[in-house]
Amino acid sequence: MDGADGRLGVLMGSGHEAALSAEPTLRKLGPKPMRIPPVILLALAPGVLIPNLLAQNPTSPPNVVPTGVLSVSDPDLEVTLWAQSPQLKNPTNLDFDGEGRVWVAEGVNYRGHHQRQPEGDRIVVLEDTDGDGRADSQSVFVQEKGLLAPMGLAVIDNRVIVSMAPDIIVYTDVNRDRKFDPAVDRREVLLTGFNGRRHDHSIHSVTQGPNGQWYWNAGNCGSMFTDKSGRTFRIGSAYDGGRDLGWEPMKIAGMKSDDGHVWIGGFAARMNPDGSQVRIIGHNFRNSYEQTVTSFGDVFQNDNDDPPACRTTFLLESGNAGFCSADGKRSWGADRRPGQSVPVAEWRQEDPGTMPPGDVYGGGSPTGIAFVEDSALGPKYRGLLLSCEPGRNVVFGYLPKPEGAGFALKRFDFLTSNREGEFSGTDFQGGSNPQRQLKTLFRPSDVGVGADGAIYVADWFDPRVGGHADWDDTTSGAIYRIAPKGHRSRPAKVDLSTPKGAAEALKNPVLHVRAAAYNALQAQGPSAIKPVERLLKDPNPHVRARAAWVLSLDPRQGLPKVAGLLKDSDPQIRVVAFRALHQAAEKNVVADNSGSSRKQAPGSRAFFLETAQRLASDPSPAVRREVAVSLRDEPYEIAGPILLTLADGFDGTDRTYLEAWGTGATGKEAQVYGALVAKSQGRGAVQWTPALAALAWRLHPESSIRDFKARGLAESLSDAERKRALTALGFNASPAAADAVLEVAAKSSGTVKAEAMWWLLNRKD
């Protein structure tokens, strides 16, 4: 009995988990119910097995992972249970408002259980009204039969954006009572055409970025939609996600969209809040569950995979993750080359045109992601990236550090129930969970920062994750709060009615409170300039960045101040300034002084191009990266000289820089290649520097065939360099390229010959 009493203290954690008292039964979590005597239940500890968890009992409380099972990385922080079923069920996504409320999208009707709740799924609102650190109020904002496990939720002022395939739905709470009433409030389908009605590889959550645009993504089920500007996007892949909408995803793979580019699902995009001017910002994912956008405008995401190569990644603008072939017709497995590991093959890291995968950590099923800039955790955690990984019972933490043109992502377990790494109930462990341990039931589905600055984590709670399965018939869920020990919930008052109040709200820890502040300042016009300008002196660089984005809205007073930030000592602030000026130029907010001797005004296209040429020699690779990707749709006559300057700054090894540069050369590869080789002072292909060889490899136009054949045949080069030359030839569709590979195969031996033969046998078409 002494041992049982000791374990009970661990089980009960902070005392909030009365739901796991000495109840003789737990709820049914699997197909084989059984009874557990109270003495056994009392003895349960995190590492003790829970045999085939148990029979249903209408009077028993819902299940929850006790806080004593959870551990947080910092001893100065504590985990408390903020909410649990029946206050919420099966949480798929969270968002937060400025008053401290947590909004939850539920997924009771998930996949095979789509009829479990005939009234449809809900968006619920939870609140801690007495400040004791525990939700005590619950209401339902909306419940509809058409809501079947919605995968995304955003709350921006009185607009509630729900991602429910095939639609992005915007509810406007006109009277702000947090209860949708169709007689008073508005419901609009903003965009439609996302395949996968009951599939979690479809449309995911919307996030407002610091530039006022909405960011969102969809998995690889396929999408064909028309934005409010009238442009249609056709995004398929080699994955058959069903035919819910009357077209086949695999048949639209490789088709051009109306923006002139070929995009492969999954993908991420940004657009104006009215659904116009969609721009794809990354593609060829498997199923990225969510994205997070920093105040600098950097985008981070995670992506689940065919085990074992899940990843957390900095998303390069227009980046190709490489899950399918460039035309979307073939899976990564069909193109896997001899000697390639799964991570290298799956994210095509030896192919030109694919971005670095970031942190590839193995099997899993990543879900929600958040970037922490302002929180109760203090300056130590400013810039903390959090990524939920339910397959591993953990919320990963990263503190991204600039590294070349990208970021170093060093992973640690921020919050976990499974320090031992004994996983079960996941695809990478075979799917089944015959030995269900309490520590493996923690399935974090989303994470974010609340109005009190604490971190909130939603728990799906289930023995199974992945494979479109859920085994918890109780549909239990919970929300945990991570904060400094003794933290009291005191959300700051938000006043968006005045420029001063709205400017102050730009410092709020809640992402979409800051978004509402941006929108309010935009509506207030020039009167907002002075209070926002003061924020440029804030010691927090994220606050300075937010101010820059708001100032870029004003052509006369604001944009010149943003232009002044191009000389800032912080490279990230220079990145923000350049991005803001580029996006202003895209919107044509300022006319060019064509034919005039007057200096070009910030915000004009001419000023943007002058700035791009100047910053092509910036000491920061990150700044030069942004210059490179901004040139994608520019003609060679404009982009060529800038790209050649950027080429001089390539160190020969920085893959993010190389891909950014290649993105800038899109559609003009042959011209850039010719100029690049001409600039090499007559060096033959075999004598190319490593930097020139990599740049040429990234371009690989038809005019490069002779040069790469020479490199493939050159025994003076390493086998790795010769195989890289074969890759450049293999990615060229010209018959001359096939002849070149054949010649290399005939005249080589060993691994080079084997590589050449692979290309010949696998590119017969």
Task: State where each predicted segment sits.
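Bacterial N-terminal signal peptides that target proteins for export
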Residues: 29-41
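Beta-propeller domains with acidic blade repeats across secreted/periplasmic ectodomains
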Residues: 55-501, 512, 516, 520-523
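Long, ordered, helix-rich scaffold segments
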Residues: 475, 482-593, 599, 604-765
